[in-house]
Design a protein with these regions (language model features):
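Structured alpha/beta or helical-core interaction and ligand-binding surfaces enriched in interleaved
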Residues: 1-115, 119-121
Length: 121
């Protein structure tokens, strides 16, 4: 198991521990059997409720630490899972992001087309 919260790791170290292994991710099923993507709209209560239920279904502990970054790894944020859930509009906006578990067991990718996917190593 990898500890991505190690204070000795630089941004480029984190990137090297994650990106080369993205091909190993097993993505959860999405809207149908041909896609791993699901709708990540928070524009109305119904869509937001479906998204939150889907995220809660991933059984991630509220206190679990995650790293959020853009695709260029230029803007890293360290948060607890509960903080992500509490402020989805901040993270699910007009930017591609990766949310990586601090122990590199799972990853979530959001695309600005309001779609998201979740996978595990």
């Amino acid at each position: 198991m990898v500890n991505l919260l190690n204070p000795d790791l630089r941004v480029r170290d984190l990137r090297k521990l994650v990106e080369p292994h993205l091909h190993e991710v097993s993505w959860d099923r999405g809207v149908d059997e041909t896609s791993e993507w699901v709708i990540a709209s928070i524009e109305d209560c119904e869509h937001k409720s479906k998204l939150v239920n889907w995220l809660n279904g991933k059984n991630v502990s509220d206190s679990f630490e995650v790293i959020i970054t853009d695709k260029a790894w230029s803007n890293l944020r360290y948060l607890c899972w509960s903080q992500v859930l509490a402020d989805l509009p901040t993270y699910f906006d007009q930017e591609n992001i990766l949310i990586v578990s601090s122990n590199r067991t799972w990853i979530m990718e959001y695309a600005p087309q309001q779609i998201v996917r979740f996978g595990q190593w």
